[in-house]
Amino acid sequence: MKSNFKYFLSLFVIQIFINPLYLLANQQIKGFDTGQNKKSKVVALTSLSADLVGNLSISSLVGIPGSSLFKNEKEFQNIPIVSRGRMQPDIEKIISLKPDFVIGAKGFHDKTLRKLEDLGISTISTNIKSFKDLESFESQLQNLLSTKKKGNLENNLKSCYLKIDSSRNNKNVLALVSLKPMLSPNSESWSGSLIKRFGFDNLTADLPSKGEFKGYLNINQEWLLKNQPNNLLLVKTPASSLDQYKSLTIWNKLSAVKNKKIFGFEYYGFINPGSLSSINKACKKLSNI
């Protein structure tokens, strides 16, 4: 009974921390006139959209989500916070800021965005699952903000634009996002797209995602032992540590463990894009494998 409780608790934690992945830019814009010349006022409900808007036009950003990623960022300190954690945004506060449009995450913010649309406020629903999505979103924001400042992802994400060494094609990797259940990303996830960007052979890239976490699939210890990845990418979520993976009964039988090819990754940047800084850190780690 106790083990069942731990399993369902793990599912709950994973649901909280993985789902935002899919809630972040294939853009669906409602009610916004892209031809206007006035300075736009934006409320961003995700940390990544806030960072992107701030990078293009910090004066346009009038509302942001409360996020640990902004704790030491001076430019965000005096901008009103409209949401915290997994709580739904404060609609009254958003309205009081009189934004021209509000950027939210597809799925998680659907209800909030619908209410704002009913009140005549334009919205953008985002769903970033690849680097291409990120580049497209920044380009679109530049047009929406009517700013002459060009997108400069390459300057902010220098580690993500490094020349790829062709020798990496001979390196296979396996990323483990969690232990119970044991989840690994395929090519339809943000982390899967980053792995592909660096030319690695992701052992689960082409395997179908059949569970509740789209872009991620369940694997077991038998599969892991049979496929023997050369490199293991282990993710530390806000609710776990890297030491949890050592509890696997097959841990010491894995060639990646024997050869000390274990690489730790933070949740933000690798699983949930989070911010430009966290994405760049994830890319830097991938470039060092």
Positions of predicted regions on the chain:
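Bacterial Sec-exported substrate-binding components of ABC uptake systems
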Residues: 2-52, 89, 147-176, 226-228, ...
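Structured C-terminal subdomain patch of bacterial secreted/periplasmic proteins
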Residues: 40-41, 45, 132-146, 150-155, ...
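A short, structured surface patch at a secondary-structure boundary
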Residues: 41-97, 101-106, 203
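His/Asp/Glu-enriched short active-site or ligand-binding loop at hydrolase and phosphoryl-transfer sites
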Residues: 65, 71, 191-213, 234, ...
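Flexible loop/hinge segments that line or gate small-molecule binding clefts
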Residues: 73, 112-140, 264
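Short helix-initiation/N-cap motifs at beta->coil->alpha
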Residues: 82-92, 209-222
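Alpha-to-beta junction loops
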Residues: 98-102, 200, 228-232
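Extracytoplasmic ligand-binding site segments that recognize negatively charged/polar headgroups
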Residues: 127-139, 175-194
